[in-house]
Amino acid sequence: MSKEKFQRTKLHINVGTIGHVDHGKTTLTAAITAVLAKAYGGNALAFDQIDNAPEEKARGITINTSHVEYDTKNRHYAHVDCPGHADYVKNMITGAAQMDGAILVVAATDGPMPQTREHILLARQVGVPYIIVFINKCDMVDDSELLELVEIEVRELLSQYEFPGENTPIIRGSALKALEHDVDWTSKIIELAEVLDSYIPEPKRAIDKPFLLPIEDVFSISGRGTVVTGRVERGILKVGEEVEIIGIKNTTKTTCTGVEMFRKLLDEGRAGENIGVLLRGVKRDDVERGQVLAKPGSIKPHTKFASEVYILNKDEGGRHTPFFKGYRPQFYFRTTDVTGTIELPIDVEMVMPGDNIKMIVNLIAPIAMDQGLRFAIREGGRTVGAGIVTDIIE
């Protein structure tokens, strides 16, 4: 029991492996758990324990993902690994597994391949802030010039997608040899662990960000006024502070005159808590589900944005047929649906179920949004896609 307690004192970081099929992402994941379990305690997992990933649902989409955990000298890591390319696309777009940093696995025998590029692009689009490179299968390449070449190609590719290619840490190793406890190669896993600790900074916690609460319900309490309820997404709201009500209608400003949780009055509501907020001088009809309460000036309402979207296939309960420009589904942000129209890239005539695609969306009503906000695409309450805001246009 004491060990559990000890782990909680360590800083917690979320990471994952990305990269081309068969370049050794899962083998590396297994090697990390094996080598670090020996060095710092924890459980070693075999390749097949990680490879048959359980299904999970995120925003109505089924994704196969393996979650493993391990300790380094200074930190505790939660690590995601996906068996298939489509699972990565879905995972990154839905944000099912948010990553503070990613380990890009590139086989020395192949160099960068199409999915290497696609995963780097996705990491850029969905806001994965840091990438570390592990060049795998180095035991199979005798020519050091070839390794140099692979390294140069990877750095160029990272720079192309606005990651700092020149300064990205690159480790050369062999996951398979490390799993066989070959000391020359286990040392590379330890090196990777040290780089994870030093290169990925401590992420900013939700509680330190500006206050935001997506409104789920609105009540009027006679003699007290209007109460909105919801789960605080980020930040802290103290009684007496000003807040803005943003989205759907024109933005208005009011003051929080009370915070309650489980029918008890509090001085403040914090990230992660389900609270009721009493608002001064606000009528029941002025507020609705789908709006947000936010720190004044911290977030703005928008109607037009660029996005990266995954469209469910038929087996996932999605559409059976493609759609074309002029498609008008609902876009579900936080707690509500808003109808919108889409613009497809010039060279795209139609979008098939199972595709991932960039699209520009025009909403009929404004929603409080920042880059990185995730949404579902729905038709009559049924989820047909998932997306992330990559750029705000207006």
Curated annotation (Swiss-Prot):
Region (G5) residue spans: 174-176
Entry EC no(s): 3.6.5.3
Protein's UniProt name: Elongation factor Tu
G2: region residues: 60-64
Complex and partners: Monomer.
InterPro entries: EF-Tu_GTP-bd, EF-Tu_GTPase, EFTu-like_2, EFTU_2, G_TR_CS, P-loop_NTPase, Small_GTP-bd, T_Tr_GTP-bd_dom
Catalytic activity: GTP + H2O = GDP + phosphate + H(+)
GO cellular component: cytosol
Residues at which GTP binds: 19-26, 81-85, 136-139
Native species: Baumannia cicadellinicola subsp. Homalodisca coagulata
HAMAP family for this protein: EF_Tu_B
Residue ranges, annotated region (G4): 136-139
Key words of the record: Cytoplasm, Elongation factor, GTP-binding, Hydrolase, Magnesium, Metal-binding, Nucleotide-binding, Protein biosynthesis
Functional note: GTP hydrolase that promotes the GTP-dependent binding of aminoacyl-tRNA to the A-site of ribosomes during protein biosynthesis.
